Amino acid sequence: MRNLQWFPGHMTKAMRMMEENAALTKDAFADRLAKTLEKRSQLLKIMSMNHYDMESSSRPERLTEFKVAYGESLRAMMRCLEQYFPEMPTAEKQNFIYAFFPFMFGIYPYTVVNEKQREAMEKAGVNYVFMTIYELTCKCARHLLGS
């Protein structure tokens, strides 16, 4: 759990960075959000591991510490959505958050594919579209925002 401590801090910094802009379009917001994760492959790799087991085996005080910080990052995202998209209904903002945050747990395995996986997909006839962390994240955020 110790390695995950910097996840909420990163999100808080990312939200703070976005808060420096008085206004952003949906596309610009998606772009900024994607850029905050683009260089965080290690974070995304940790998140894609068996998170449930990691939390289950963590000491209660560490897990609580993480959950407090995680809650702060959810609230930071809500503040950004409220600032940039005041016309968006609260339910839609919540839908964005509760779709985007779980989505982050799957970014790494969809964007970092080793040669063995690539070869297996090719042999299996899987028409897989390879995307970067930025591309996948930006597409998801744009879709969730209706952009």
Q: Where do the model's predicted regions map?
A:
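Hydrophobic alpha-helical connector segments
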Residues: 2, 6-45, 90, 96-100
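Non-membrane alpha-helical structural segments and their capping/turn regions in soluble enzymes
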Residues: 5, 27, 64-75, 94, ...
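Secondary-structure edge/capping motif, primarily at the C-terminal ends of alpha-helices
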Residues: 14-22, 51-55, 81, 115
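Short, charged/polar micro-motifs that form catalytic or ligand-binding hotspots
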Residues: 23, 64-67, 86, 90
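Short secondary-structure transition hinges
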Residues: 34, 38-75, 128
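A short small-residue
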Residues: 53-58, 92, 120-124
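C-terminal peripheral helix-coil segments that are non-catalytic and often amphipathic
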Residues: 75-79, 83, 87, 103-147
